[in-house]
Swiss-Prot record:
Residues 1-12 have a biased composition (Gly residues). Residues 1-37 are annotated as: Disordered. Belongs to the UPF0157 (GrpB) family. Signal peptide: none annotated. Coiled coil: none annotated. It holds the Pfam family GrpB. This is UPF0157 protein DR_2534. SUPFAM superfamilies: Nucleotidyltransferase. It comes from the Bacteria. The lineage of its organism: Bacteria, Thermotogati, Deinococcota, Deinococci, Deinococcales.
Length: 188
């Protein structure tokens, strides 16, 4: 699948790698989690935000996921939330800008850059102001202001990454934690 190609599927391949020198990569069996690198992740987000704004000038764009928290280990992939009125049209504009569609659900299409094998960013296109938009931001913001919960999330991710190299299973196993955090965040 080349850059700009349409690839829809449930799984997302992750690399199997040995530890990177300097202690940055934490050993896992299937997914590499690296130590926090908030400056580099913020710079990568800014580069992609610029690229996204060229394709979608009116889109709302937010840095989400573990790399946005900045204090916990994460896969070296920046997650970006893009809010638009027409998710399909927005995704197609991003394909024209070089992003590759990886999957879709109702009101949510996700794309990667530069390709699924060398992913440095995943862009989640959702309805601006919709449920998915609010949940992603609520989760990020709660973990940013709750260091103990962020550390618990980090520990869960490390355990799961060591147990599986299947992206779908890794994500599904985090679902209960995410649901609990969303409930707590909504109550606070």
């Amino acid at each position: 699948m080349g850059r700009g190609g349409r690839g829809v599927g449930g799984g997302r391949p992750e690399g199997h790698g040995a530890s990177v020198e300097g202690g940055r990569t934490r050993q896992t069996e299937g997914m590499d989690l690296i130590s926090p690198d908030p400056g580099r992740w913020a710079a990568r987000f800014d580069r992609h935000r610029w690229r996204i704004r060229l394709a979608l000038p009116q889109a709302r764009t937010e840095h989400i996921g573990s790399t946005a928290i900045g204090t916990i280990c994460a896969k070296d992939v920046v997650d970006i939330l893009v809010g638009e009125v027409d998710v399909t049209a927005a995704a197609q504009a991003l394909v024209s800008a070089g992003y590759v569609i990886e999957g879709e659900r109702p009101n949510h299409i996700w794309l990667c850059w530069p390709d699924p094998q060398q992913r440095e960013a995943v862009v989640h296109v959702v309805i601006a102001g919709g449920d998915i938009w609010h949940q992603r931001l609520l989760f990020r913001d709660f973990l940013k202001r709750s260091p103990a919960e962020a550390r618990a999330y980090e520990a869960l991710k490390q355990r799961l990454a060591a147990q599986t190299d299947d992206w779908g299973e890794y994500t599904a196993q985090k679902a209960a934690f995410v649901a609990r955090i969303l409930q707590r965040a909504a109550e606070s």
